From Swiss-Prot:
Sections of the chain in a coiled coil: 364-480, 736-763
Matches recorded under CDD domains: KISc_BimC_Eg5
Domain of life: Eukaryota
Oligomeric form and interacting partners: Interacts with the thyroid hormone receptor in the presence of thyroid hormone. Component of a large chromatin remodeling complex, at least composed of MYSM1, PCAF, RBM10 and KIF11/TRIP5. Interacts (via C-terminus) with the kinase NEK6 in both interphase and mitosis. Interacts with RARRES1 and AGBL2. Interacts with TPX2.
UniProt-recorded name of the protein: Kinesin-like protein KIF11
Keywords: Acetylation, ATP-binding, Cell cycle, Cell division, Coiled coil, Cytoplasm, Cytoskeleton, Disease variant, Isopeptide bond, Microtubule, Mitosis, Motor protein, Nucleotide-binding, Phosphoprotein, Ubl conjugation
Its biological purpose: Motor protein required for establishing a bipolar spindle and thus contributing to chromosome congression during mitosis. Required in non-mitotic cells for transport of secretory proteins from the Golgi complex to the cell surface.
Residues bearing the modification Phosphoserine: S1033
Annotated localization: Cytoplasm; Cytoplasm, Cytoskeleton, Spindle pole
Phosphoprotein found in the keyword field: yes
Main location: cytoplasm
Amino acid sequence: MASQPNSSAKKKEEKGKNIQVVVRCRPFNLAERKASAHSIVECDPVRKEVSVRTGGLADKSSRKTYTFDMVFGASTKQIDVYRSVVCPILDEVIMGYNCTIFAYGQTGTGKTFTMEGERSPNEEYTWEEDPLAGIIPRTLHQIFEKLTDNGTEFSVKVSLLEIYNEELFDLLNPSSDVSERLQMFDDPRNKRGVIIKGLEEITVHNKDEVYQILEKGAAKRTTAATLMNAYSSRSHSVFSVTIHMKETTIDGEELVKIGKLNLVDLAGSENIGRSGAVDKRAREAGNINQSLLTLGRVITALVERTPHVPYRESKLTRILQDSLGGRTRTSIIATISPASLNLEETLSTLEYAHRAKNILNKPEVNQKLTKKALIKEYTEEIERLKRDLAAAREKNGVYISEENFRVMSGKLTVQEEQIVELIEKIGAVEEELNRVTELFMDNKNELDQCKSDLQNKTQELETTQKHLQETKLQLVKEEYITSALESTEEKLHDAASKLLNTVEETTKDVSGLHSKLDRKKAVDQHNAEAQDIFGKNLNSLFNNMEELIKDGSSKQKAMLEVHKTLFGNLLSSSVSALDTITTVALGSLTSIPENVSTHVSQIFNMILKEQSLAAESKTVLQELINVLKTDLLSSLEMILSPTVVSILKINSQLKHIFKTSLTVADKIEDQKKELDGFLSILCNNLHELQENTICSLVESQKQCGNLTEDLKTIKQTHSQELCKLMNLWTERFCALEEKCENIQKPLSSVQENIQQKSKDIVNKMTFHSQKFCADSDGFSQELRNFNQEGTKLVEESVKHSDKLNGNLEKISQETEQRCESLNTRTVYFSEQWVSSLNEREQELHNLLEVVSQCCEASSSDITEKSDGRKAAHEKQHNIFLDQMTIDEDKLIAQNLELNETIKIGLTKLNCFLEQDLKLDIPTGTTPQRKSYLYPSTLVRTEPREHLLDQLKRKQPELLMMLNCSENNKEETIPDVDVEEAVLGQYTEEPLSQEPSVDAGVDCSSIGGVPFFQHKKSHGKDKENRGINTLERSKVEETTEHLVTKSRLPLRAQINL
């Protein structure tokens, strides 16, 4: 029984695989809606059924239902069709199979849309992302994606063939001649394959090249507009993809695996009357319908398994010969229209598709070629081409006219086709003859075997009846002995049960004793192991601890010695450094007073020079005032004589003089502002000097440079006006510059000692600046007052020109008074300047004294600080020494503590060894000694002879039993009849009941049974006789097998 599934699977593989048939229904188009057509097709994708209503709208009961491998309704998308139909086939192509997918159906039902698809409006998607893309672009996209992801080395070649009016054209031909026809020949390597001479195979490297090839081929394909479809395909197209993949075996040998995929877009069948095709279009429609009709006849012949299949009646069927009934995996996509206008065409398409489901193909993997075999094949092809080329160049062959060559080649092709057809017919007849002879011989042998088996069975039945009577007598004896054995068995069972109970008690007691021994042994073993391990670990731990203590104490002693030496060196170096600092500081402090005194003497000399200059300026001003006075008197005397006109001129001149005096006053005021700014800058610089005493000498030099530049800029701005007055100021500024330059040199050494005095200098400078500003304000105010009085005088002179002579003396007196007042004020100003210079001299004396005091104080501070620093270092050294002694004490204490811990650990060890070990404590479960009660003797059955003697003594009872058995004879004899009936049923039933054999059993392995089984349905007597003999032989084989099985228990019973 276990071998039956394997044999059935093997038969199924030998039988082949059915072609996959898929039905796709398109939605309504605009023309069908305008014609008010109604839907007659219902698609059920779940149950895979298509139902067609054939009785119109009113009659809903009359319908035809077809079942297919897959069904897609009107709402199905392109991607759904691709994933369901093409993806599994594509995997088989990569595995090395040849596969074919072609669309079949009426024109305008969506075959080209399913195979090629369309581009979305405005081309907003790429080829691979376009939802309207068909099977061909999606397939090529996935081929490149899968092969690239697998990482295998591969090459892809494509070709595009067109069958138009039963002529072959290459749509990928690079030449401009589109009408060049191709020739088709049989493939010598594949009996069912064909070779198309001159067909261009283009190697593609990526998806973009494939899309360009598809566009190029679609542009060359013949299409035209009909009433059924605006872009009706007028030809069949075959798009072939050949994939060469390289594989490496375990031994390192390189193999080439070849897979081929044919994507066929058939032209649709059409009704010329409905499509409106005339002239050329009508001839095209006739050729299309003729090729599709041949395809239908081929499908019918393959389904009915006729000996001759008309592949050669059309070039389309000849190309698809291997796909229909060959070694190719084939899928058909049947497209239909849901409209009632196309009812006849829809039913025809569904009938063809449903019939094609029964076609059996035997897909085989293409033979994998080794690298050497492939190179050898290419080399032979190259040599053949070289020979042809050499013959053509040397002109050694036979040359005939082109017309004769065409006639001869046509005859050869016709003869070759006839020869192939005759060979196929002869092969079919010979195969049929061989099958019939084999069936006849098998049936004859089976009949002879059945006769011999029947004779053997009759003899066995006779001997069995003889043995039956003997067996009955033996049965009575055995029953009596069996009853005696049963009673003995009961007694033995009771004794055995008692013994078993006793054994159970003893085993429990023994197990308790053993468990006690195990506990004791476990405790002893645990204590021994724990004691041993603990002792070893503790000894190693203490040894390590002692070594660590010794190493730590030695390292700490060495560290303390290093600390002592380091701190001694540090103390000596710090004392020497302090000594050098003290000597340098004292030397610098002794040099500071000398430098200050020299600079102060220079400043005194400058002040004396300024005093002399002030005296000279005083005399010069007095002389100028006198000259001004004399000039004024002479001018007044000269003015008295002219007329009123000259007075007006003088009035204008006075106005001009007053304007100039205003400008002079403004300039003096500006000078005062600039001087205020200069003094404020100087004060700020002094404040910065006070705050930034730690800054370097470079910054102080930069500040002095800025001060010099400011003085130079002030001197340049005021050099053009008030020449005499500015000469004094320039000299004074030059003196200040020299003082600043002289003071700048010792600033680097004195700047730390004059921090306190700088505040006083700033205050004094601010006081003098305020005083100078007040004096300048008074001078400018007087000039302004003078200006106002002059203006009033001019106005009065203008108004009172008639009274000029009377007031002339008064004017002269007022001028004299003003000159005197000016003289006095100038003298007062000079005296004030001299007094300010004296005050500065006094301040410099005070500054010198303060600097000397500061130097002395700083020197004393330095010596005190150095002494304090030395004392601090000595104190720190003593502290470190004390700390080291404390550390030594701590180390000693730590060693003592470690020794104490070691002692404690030893005490704990002793405690563990004495107290912590486990002891064997009694649990009270140990069994006590006791006595067991059990039977000491066993019952035995009496010997067979004694039992038979007892049976003879009971003869009357035996006779009664025999009488009872004779009365029951009627029951025992039918039992034998039943056995004979069963045996007869196995031998006779198959001969009388032929319908018990399943007509659907796969019998292909017994020589062409499916072919004749199919013939039986057509009522041919010869085939019926053959199948009847086959059935009888098979049934007799099974009968023999069953009889042998039923005989074995009977023989065993007889032997008993």
